[in-house]
Regions:
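C-terminal catalytic core of tyrosine-transesterase DNA break-rejoin enzymes
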Residues: 7, 11, 112-136, 143
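Basic, Lys/Arg- and aromatic-enriched nucleic-acid-binding interface segment
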Residues: 1-16, 42, 67
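C-terminal secondary-structure termini that scaffold catalytic or DNA-interacting sites
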Residues: 159-174
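Conserved tyrosine-mediated DNA breakage-rejoining catalytic core shared by Y-recombinases
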Residues: 12, 16-17, 21-55
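Short, leucine-enriched amphipathic alpha-helices that occur as contiguous helical runs
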Residues: 1-3, 87, 91, 112-113, ...
Length: 174
């Protein structure tokens, strides 16, 4: 379960609230996508990476208790077994994994920032990233891009190489 939860945050850019609000019907395995119920009742469709589908299926088939809850992620044991996870439960899950892993700065929202930075490094356009993250203003999306000096240098070098191949720098074309 915890792998699937972090996968939705890290590989789909979901907010913790969006993860705990996921229902089984929101997942389209065949289509490879998930319907997200975002802020202010706005919906968006986000693609599901194959690795995340595998983690999701392991959770459903091996861990998720039988329950009438339509929520995808539920409590696995104890008196609240089968009830939907809460924000508090997500915080406890992350606290537990920080403790056993020694990674002190891992939190749900940092995974969303990592998603934004990784997608940018992979070359996704800013308007596309904005849609995936459920933003209505590109300025908000820019907060998640997290460009580092090396990222800027790499992009600059790619642009220079592109100009060279078009012979603009060499002065033969303008």
């Amino acid at each position: 379960r915890d792998i699937a939860i972090t996968g939705f945050m890290l590989f789909c850019g979901l907010r913790s609230r969006e993860v705990i609000n996921l229902k089984s019907d929101d997942i389209g395995i065949t289509e490879g996508q998930v319907l997200i119920h975002g802020k202010a009742g706005k919906e968006r469709i986000v693609p599901l990476p194959k690795d995340l589908i595998a983690a999701f299926e392991r959770y459903i088939n091996l861990e998720r208790p039988k329950t009438d809850s339509p929520h995808l992620f539920v409590v696995l044991k104890g008196p609240h077994r089968g009830l939907p996870l809460t924000h508090c439960a997500i915080r406890k899950i992350f606290r537990y994994h920080r403790k056993i892993s020694g990674v002190s700065n891992a939190n749900p929202h940092r995974f969303r920032h990592t998603f934004g930075a990784n997608m940018t490094r992979a070359g996704i356009s800013l308007p596309m990233l904005m849609k995936l993250m459920g933003h209505t203003d590109v300025r908000i999306t820019m907060r998640y891009v997290n460009l580092f000096a090396q990222d800027i240098k790499d992009e600059f070098n790619k642009a220079i190489a592109n100009l060279r191949t078009r012979e603009i720098i060499n002065g033969t074309k303008s």
